Amino acid sequence: MTEAQTACPTTETPVAAPVAPRWRVADVIALYELPFNDLLFRAQQTHREHFDANAIQLSTLLSIKTGGCEEDCGYCSQSAHHDTGLKAEKLMEVDAVLAAARTAKENGATRFCMGAAWRNPKDRHIEPIKEMIRGVKDMGLETCVTLGMLEEHQAKALAEAGLDYYNHNLDTSPEFYGQIISTRTYQDRLDTLERVRDAGINVCCGGIIGMGESRRERAGLIAQLANMNPYPESVPINNLVAIEGTPLENAQALDPFEFVRTIAVARITMPKAMVRLSAGREQLDDSMQALCFLAGANSMFYGDVLLTTGNPRAEADRKLLARLGMSATEATQLSA
């Protein structure tokens, strides 16, 4: 044998080449800047490849612990840093949450989301929340919770309870984030999302537009979401509700066509995700909501209140879907 043949094999691991992002911010901006009809046509084509274009999932959101949050998110009425007149409340009893879930199901919802205004839950909170999750799932409803930042063992505990989705929004682009929040870093959010993913829970992650950000910064948010590996299974898009007493109470209202564009861009860049119309629907008239469905939104939050802000009344939503010939279903992906 030659010296080369008898030499010990190397133990060094080859360094992998950096993976290029699927979507550069410039690419997302290019989508935003397409003529409106072209953008919606492309989004609708993408939507039909993966979903029934006339199916909408109805989700109901319940605030299970309201107010007193330690974070200083500039848009939020529940922050203890802002004087919005909202009184802090304790975590709801399990039976009360399950009663609300039953009502939501009776009203046509197939997804029930539970939100708590915490920076992060204490371990003592996890057990009653697990009971809520199990009880809601026993009703045949899809479950989602949003509790703030999670530790690894907390994410695993929620997964053991059968949680379907954990919501933890990025809110905006990394570049604009510091103008909205100072008490939690962008990386804090990404770390929680990684723990959720590692625990085997589906990720629900989106953001809020209309906070004074530029189109480039909106594109930065979409690129950040779309470049996650994998991208979120659920992407809620919120239209800012300017709440008196918050730093963003005087924010200029977003052009509704820009909101529709954002829905379309989210659909194109994350084709298999549930794209959800979330807070701020009250600011969109029926025609604009119809355009959002055309752009690829296939879920909406349903009921009179989202956490602490108003929402179109359930009866109005049912009438709108009927006028459009759309049906309230689970809007599951088409089979391959």
Swiss-Prot record:
Its EC number is 2.8.1.6. Catalyzes the conversion of dethiobiotin (DTB) to biotin by the insertion of a sulfur atom into dethiobiotin via a radical-based mechanism. Residues 54-281 form the Radical SAM core domain. PANTHER family: BIOTIN SYNTHASE, BIOTIN SYNTHASE, MITOCHONDRIAL. Homodimer. Belongs to the radical SAM superfamily. Biotin synthase family. Keywords: 2Fe-2S, 4Fe-4S, Biotin biosynthesis, Iron, Iron-sulfur, Metal-binding, S-adenosyl-L-methionine, Transferase. This is Biotin synthase. CDD domains: Radical_SAM. It catalyses: (4R,5S)-dethiobiotin + (sulfur carrier)-SH + 2 reduced [2Fe-2S]-[ferredoxin] + 2 S-adenosyl-L-methionine = (sulfur carrier)-H + biotin + 2 5'-deoxyadenosine + 2 L-methionine + 2 oxidized [2Fe-2S]-[ferredoxin]. One of its GO terms (biological process) is biotin biosynthetic process. Its cofactor is [4Fe-4S] cluster; [2Fe-2S] cluster. Disulfide bonds: none annotated. GO terms for molecular function: 2 iron, 2 sulfur cluster binding; 4 iron, 4 sulfur cluster binding; biotin synthase activity; iron ion binding. Binds 1 [4Fe-4S] cluster. The cluster is coordinated with 3 cysteines and an exchangeable S-adenosyl-L-methionine. Binds 1 [2Fe-2S] cluster. The cluster is coordinated with 3 cysteines and 1 arginine. Pfam families: BATS, Radical_SAM. Pathway: Cofactor biosynthesis; biotin biosynthesis; biotin from 7,8-diaminononanoate: step 2/2. [2Fe-2S] cluster binds at C113, C144, C204, R276. [4Fe-4S] cluster binds at C69, C73, C76. The lineage of its organism: Bacteria, Pseudomonadati, Pseudomonadota, Betaproteobacteria, Burkholderiales. HAMAP family: BioB.
